[in-house]
């Protein structure tokens, strides 16, 4: 999978920009606050429909403009696919092959991307919310069914919490409707949990291979799923997970009615990264934490390829400066030649000697971009 063309109109500090990307490695060079990250963000938004940096979509629209538009041409094994997303105060509109898409699950997955930014190093030591978002975004790209189930789960969860609040405030007394919402939550929650467990097993395989390589065989990485409900590892069938979640929700109802909140389910779960038998978040060194984060992010490349038959597009936002020399080499060895990569940096000095393929270099200054292929 490749992004062959990208056009921005009134996106952040870009008035109008049109670029083509014939090469596998694309470097965006410039000082800070010139628009490098905005460019990578636009590719991410084109793929995922949302920014990874802000939930306020107005920030994506250029100053005194009514809307921003991102369009691109994606090349797959099956042919080229034009994509477009229009962002305005009225919301977002997405198009595939010039046809508007009504459902998110019909759009996401047309362009698969992996973003690696300095903040992704907090994947290991950050909050559980960071890790839940990670698995939801990555799994959602390769499985439209998961994305649908997740959206349904979140919708029912919101309704259930609202109804719990109404019951707590005595505005409602009918618990039959709560039973219905609880059954729906267990149905979709079980599906989300089932998909996550399967995905993590595959991710662990690829991540451990990379982690052992980076650590020269000294460390083994495993990933544990920390569920908010007890899980019987002898029966991880969809039906068993749904029944267990339903039973735990029913058992916890008194507390939920008192607190007017849902305390159990995939929205409360977490991931644990275990290196040589110890939780790296708690006991790992900074080096181990960074190796783990790098292994997890790079593992997504092979995992997405195995799931979709296509390599994703890799977005590296000023991450090279956060990695030591050895980890930089492992990263570049993993991606070069097989993964189209967009990399931002303020200087080429620390990476130019490690490159084995000739990149396209784009100079970014105040929302203007100039190409120069010479290194």
UniProtKB/Swiss-Prot annotation:
Its main location: cytoplasm. InterPro entries: DNA-binding_RecF, DNA-binding_RecF_CS, P-loop_NTPase, RecF/RecN/SMC_N, RecF_2. Coiled coil: none annotated. ATP binds at residues 30-37. GO terms for biological process: DNA replication; DNA synthesis involved in DNA repair; double-strand break repair; SOS response. It is found in: Cytoplasm. Keywords: ATP-binding, Cytoplasm, DNA damage, DNA repair, DNA replication, DNA-binding, Nucleotide-binding, SOS response. GO terms for molecular function: ATP binding; single-stranded DNA binding. The keyword Chloroplast does not apply. It comes from the Bacteria. The keyword DNA-binding applies. Belongs to the RecF family. The RecF protein is involved in DNA metabolism; it is required for DNA replication and normal SOS inducibility. RecF binds preferentially to single-stranded, linear DNA. It also seems to bind ATP. This is DNA replication and repair protein RecF. It comes from Enterococcus faecalis (strain ATCC 700802 / V583).
């Amino acid at each position: 999978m490749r992004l062959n063309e990208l056009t921005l109109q009134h996106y952040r500090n870009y008035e109008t920009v049109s670029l083509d990307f014939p090469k596998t490695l694309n470097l965006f060079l410039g000082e800070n606050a010139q628009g490098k990250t905005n460019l990578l963000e636009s590719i991410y938004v084109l793929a995922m429909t949302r920014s990874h940096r802000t939930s306020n979509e107005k920030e994506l629209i250029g100053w005194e403009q009514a809307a921003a538009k991102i369009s691109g041409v994606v090349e797959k094994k099956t042919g080229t696919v034009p994509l477009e997303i229009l962002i305005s105060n009225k919301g977002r509109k997405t198009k595939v092959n010039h046809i508007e898409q009504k459902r998110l699950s019909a759009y996401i997955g047309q362009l698969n991307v992996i973003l690696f930014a300095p903040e992704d190093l907090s994947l290991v030591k950050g909050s559980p919310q960071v890790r839940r978002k990670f698995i939801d975004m990555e799994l959602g790209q390769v499985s439209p069914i998961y994305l649908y189930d997740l959206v349904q789960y979140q919708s029912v969860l919101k309704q259930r919490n609202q109804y719990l609040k109404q019951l707590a405030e005595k505005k409602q007394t009918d618990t039959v409707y709560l039973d219905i919402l609880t059954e729906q939550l267990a149905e979709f929650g079980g599906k989300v949990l089932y998909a996550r467990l399967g995905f993590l097993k595959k991710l662990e395989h690829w991540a451990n291979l990379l982690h052992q390589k980076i650590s020269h065989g000294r460390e083994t990485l495993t990933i544990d799923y920390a569920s908010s409900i007890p899980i019987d590892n002898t029966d991880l069938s969809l039906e068993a997970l749904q029944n267990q979640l339903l039973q735990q929700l029913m058992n916890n109802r008194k507390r939920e009615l008192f607190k007017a909140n849902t305390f159990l389910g995939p929205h409360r779960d977490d991931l644990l990264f275990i290196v040589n038998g110890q939780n790296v978040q708690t006991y790992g060194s900074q080096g181990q934490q960074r190796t783990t984060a790098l292994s997890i992010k790079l593992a997504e490349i092979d995992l997405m390829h195995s799931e979709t038959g296509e390599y994703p597009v890799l977005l590296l936002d000023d991450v090279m400066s956060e990695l030591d020399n050895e980890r930089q080499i492992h990263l570049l060895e993993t991606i070069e030649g097989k993964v189209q990569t967009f990399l931002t940096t303020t200087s080429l000095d620390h990476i130019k000697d490690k490159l084995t393929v000739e990149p396209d270099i784009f100079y970014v200054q105040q929302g203007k971009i100039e190409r120069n292929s010479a290194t």
